[in-house]
Amino acid sequence: WGYPTGMDRYLTIDDYVNGYVNNAVDNIREKAGLDKITLLGVCQGGTLSVMYAALHPEKVKNLITLVTPVNFDTNKGLLYIWARGLDIDRIVDYYGIVPGDLLNSGFLLTDPFRLMIDKYVGIFERIECNPNDTACSLRNEETVKNFLRMEKWIFDSPDQAGETFRQFMKDCYQKNLLIKNKMELNGKKVNLKKISMPLLNVMAEFDHLVPNDASVPLNDAVSSSDKETLIFPTGHIGIFVGSKSQKEVCPGIARWLKPRSLLDGTGNGKGKGKREVRKSQASEA
């Protein structure tokens, strides 16, 4: 849904879940001629997808969550500890639209040495070579370009609509209502037990933003009999873009999804009815 502007400051989580996401799902269902579709959400988008699947289970065939927080009562990540003491009202009332740069600053401070010093020292070490080695220089040029592309993507964090940020921080981070089935959107309770479709919960073992403790409880919170967890030895960003992890993450999701995407004549996939936790052997790039 792009980058929010001043006119979007009053959009709520309900607007995103029951508005934008629901409209997108309905559009795909109509164009594909299906009753249900597979929904995959990443990080905060995964949390919104969980809410959507709980409120509209009749439209979701399979639910895939990727590094998605649902349990915010954890001390494994600084983000969760800090959030409990933040004056959310003061932040939202001051900014209206919460700047993405402000959020990025907070993310960097969760692991400042690694994220602000170590990785930049590392890139210089990676591109060191003999000045007369033309092949090495060409490889380094592409290495630097890829590094800068990644930096641009990482720091391209859209601002957040104020009221959405207010509710997400208060109801999720501070009150932990979602996992307790006490969160409400437009007066309707989000009950995770309504999620009965096949679930794939994908995590990064070394995630500093969404520790596994924040994601694992989803499996017990839903009523799905067909649910699986995949854990990859990467960080929060590495699970998307690490060269080695990409050889495992996407194929792993595809292997899980393929047998569950077969139609049984009603728009439903044929679940395999298993519960399993597997850890990938991929290395972090």
Language model regions located:
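Alpha/beta-hydrolase active-site loop
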Residues: Y10-K31
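Short beta-strand/loop motif that positions the catalytic acidic residue
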Residues: I195, N201-M203, D207
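Alpha/beta-hydrolase-fold enzymes
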Residues: E30, L34, S49-E163
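Gly/Ala-rich beta-loop-alpha elbow adjacent to hydrolase catalytic centers
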Residues: L40-G45, S49
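Short beta-strand immediately N-terminal to the catalytic nucleophile in serine-hydrolase-like folds
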Residues: L39-G41, L66, V202
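Conserved alpha/beta-hydrolase "acid-adjacent" motif
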Residues: H208-A214
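Catalytic histidine-centered segment of alpha/beta-hydrolase-like enzymes
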Residues: T234-E248
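Catalytic histidine neighborhood in serine/cysteine hydrolases
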Residues: S215, D220-I237
